[in-house]
């Protein structure tokens, strides 16, 4: 009932003594701000969220991450930054190389980011309000209380596909969006 696509099922984990927390990235869901998926800023924000969770009174100080696809990719990147409270990750079915995995297959631009942006990212952007998805448990907007115009929404997000087109080679833009596996020190 409370599971969110691509992340853990709290009804499975909570009875075993785990607290489950899912964060909305900046500009997504009910979090205001400029939406920039897969950006270094998003990883900084998630690092702070991990440290927040590790210091709550209900927390034992050990934070783990679990998830598929996008959440998998983020786990590797965050683990390589060594947040003190992160003790384990369980990533699966997620790539680490944005250039080869989702950007340019064999040097040929993939349409993945264009489709993903339209069907996944834009649908969960903060500010969709009345026009956005509803939380199936509460009936409230899952994209914040405000309803912004399409122009305002566009000003509050990066166009990932347009950004990809600016980087046809495996340059710094792609490199700062992948984890350095040699820096991942946790199980």
Where are the language model's segments positioned?
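Accessory cap/linker subdomain of secreted extracellular hydrolases
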Residues: 3-9, 15, 77-184
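Alpha/beta-hydrolase fold nucleophile elbow
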Residues: 57-70
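Cap/lid segment of the alpha/beta-hydrolase catalytic domain
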Residues: 1-54, 103, 110
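Short, conserved helix/loop micro-motifs enriched in His/Cys and acidic residues
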Residues: 25, 183-187
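Beta-sheet entry/capping signal
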Residues: 19-20, 61-64, 85-90, 187
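Glycine-rich helix-loop-beta junction characteristic of Rossmann-like nucleotide cofactor-binding loops
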Residues: 55-57, 182-183
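Catalytic nucleophile serine of serine hydrolases
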Residues: 31, 67-72, 93
